[in-house]
A protein has these predicted regions:
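Active-site and donor-binding regions of nucleotide-sugar-utilizing enzymes
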Residues: 3-151
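A nucleotide-sugar donor-handling region in carbohydrate enzymes
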Residues: 113-182, 206-207, 322-329
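Donor-nucleotide binding loops and adjacent catalytic segments primarily
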Residues: 164-243
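Short acidic-hydrophobic, aromatic-tinged amphipathic segments that line or gate anion-handling sites
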Residues: 53-59, 228-232, 298-309
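C-terminal alpha-helical cap of glycosyltransferases
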Residues: 338-356
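A donor-sugar binding/catalytic signature common to diverse glycosyltransferases
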Residues: 76-77, 89-95, 233-281
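Short hydrophobic segments within beta-strands
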Residues: 5, 32, 96, 171-173, ...
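Catalytic binding pocket for nucleotide-activated donors in carbohydrate/polymer assembly enzymes
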Residues: 131, 139, 253-330, 334
């Protein structure tokens, strides 16, 4: 048996292609999922939609007790796990980080005591090996994108969502912090009336009480005729990425995932910062973001303010190939090979003699 540790719903799109590959090779797969007051609706929907064999827990302590009792051959994590060292000699542990974006946590998560980490591309492999020379890293690519590359992800039925299939489709997928949501015009969809707009925020923006102002704005925008707001239960970004012609986002993993599909991206350089991240405390913001944020800025067209956004979007829709060379260059470094076979490489390793 191989277990996937699901602390948050957004880990699942990274896990599912690997699950399918494991099941195709006759492996038993189980998902250890953490109950959550804020996220339970999304979790229940994902379990039902994907027919997952789930074991529910309330804490890391319960998850650890389950792993110690069941002794799976592997436990795959989407983030650090404080008790990973206690699984030594019981089962193997692997890390599949749930995003490929520029936040510093992409690297610091490897401080966790995992047996192996699957990584995306040679640049990040080398950098992680420099930071953690005694740990094992395997370059497999980014499994989350496999269904789109393979063509098995059909996308959304725009007409069924009340949108016009004849219009170009924009995907606005902001992260929760730092976010551009609060800096957008209150009625911005009306200024983009010639486009369909898919709103796919981070689920924190719709479920966490501390982000209720973001939720109010998103729900307001969802009332426009040319807009579809994904409910929190619709947790998988992939159908939205498959259906969109252009992505609008801030410094998020989604930005790099979309660019890896060779589609145009507009990067919002305007975002709302908490007081604790401004002025002389701006070092906190810099610590939250990785130097890769600036290294890879050329992957997208940039809008310095909301006022610039419409013109930048129009230009990228008219000339979608204008950043194609940079997208290809940076995708190779950030996502590695985008060939639809990342999950196969991960499973090859999990079932190999090298890993046993």
């Amino acid at each position: 048996m191989i277990c996937f540790d699901v602390l948050h719903p957004y880990y699942l799109p990274q896990y599912l292609p690997v699950m399918q590959e494991l099941q195709a090779r006759g492996q038993v797969v189980r998902f250890v999922i953490y109950r959550s007051q804020d996220q339970q609706a999304a979790l229940d929907a994902l379990v039902a939609q994907n027919g997952l064999e789930a074991h529910w827990v309330d804490s890391q302590e319960e998850a650890l007790a389950y792993y110690l009792k069941e002794k799976p051959s592997w436990v795959i994590f989407g983030n650090s796990f404080d008790a990973a060292a206690k699984l030594k000699g019981i089962c193997k542990t692997a890390l599949m980080q749930h995003g490929i974006g520029p936040k510093a946590c992409y690297y610091t998560v490897s401080e966790s005591d995992m047996d192996v980490r699957f990584v995306e591309g040679e640049y990040r492999l080398k950098r992680l090996q420099q930071l953690f020379p005694h740990k094992t890293f395997i370059d497999t690519g980014y499994a989350k994108l496999d269904p789109i590359v393979q063509g098995s992800e059909a996308g959304l039925d725009l007409e069924a969502l009340g949108l016009d299939p004849a219009k170009p489709t924009l995907l606005y997928a902001p992260t929760f912090y730092p976010s551009s949501i609060e800096k957008m015009a209150k009625d911005w969809p009306s200024a983009f009336s010639e486009y369909n707009i898919l709103l796919k925020p981070h689920y924190f923006s719709l479920s966490k009480p501390s982000y209720k102002k973001q939720k109010q704005l998103l729900e307001h925008w969802g009332n426009f005729d040319n807009v579809y707001l994904a409910p929190v239960e619709q947790a998988n970004l992939l159908p939205f990425m498959a259906s969109a012609d252009l992505l609008i986002s801030d410094a998020s993993s989604a930005l790099f995932e979309f660019a890896a599909l060779d589609k145009p991206v507009v990067w919002c350089d305007f975002y709302h910062l908490r007081w604790s991240y401004r002025g002389i405390l701006s070092f906190r913001f810099k610590n939250r973001m990785d130097e890769d944020l600036y290294r890879y800025a050329g992957v997208a067209a940039h809008a310095a303010s909301y006022k610039e956004l419409k013109a930048v979007v129009d230009q990228q829709i008219a000339q979608p190939e204008s950043f194609a060379a940079k997208r290809a260059e940076y995708t190779l470094e950030l996502a590695g090979r985008v060939d639809g076979h990342s999950s196969q490489r991960i499973v090859d390793y999990l079932l190999s003699e090298e890993a046993s």
